[in-house]
Amino acid sequence: SSLGVNIIAEKAKVQKSLKKIDLCFLMAPLYHSAMKNVANVRATLKIKTIFNILGPLLNPANANNQLIGVYSEKWMLPIAKCLVKLSIKKAWIVHGLDGLDEITTTNKTVVIEVKNKRMRKFLIDPIKLGFKKSSLNKLKGKDSIYNAKEIMKLFEGKSKDSPFYDIVVLNTAAALVVSENQNSLKKAIK
């Protein structure tokens, strides 16, 4: 990758990362046999398939807390119902009203929270949380070199006035709430 991140690291390195910093990346085809069998087909189709929905539900880490983005609002309730049956401790299923499969800064985001086998639906309004309204054009990446530079600016704290910064902060805040390290988006954003 342009950042030098090994996204296909061997199991021992992934486990070490998870133990050391509570974070790791699991390339689905390497860790889940069902995903391994369909990876090539998915790559050739170049359209969204049921595997875009199944992936988070088949999480090999068996995470108790999950922030799951979906590309279509119609999938939110079915996923939430599955998570209830899987006895997930806490999850947010999110869909930006602009079509993004994450919490967006261009519009409101629909959220279904699953917590203790109960569901509730609410909206996140980025403007009410103090973010500037963005546009999909401003959030689009470009080539891998440009994208890597923008990510490095974020890591170095040099992008505080960028739409990338806002969307990363908003989604990170949501992850902190879902992981129960913060109890509100407003507190997590600060």
Label each residue range with its predicted role:
Residues 2-8, 13, 19-190:
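Glycine-rich anion-binding loops and their surrounding alpha/beta cores
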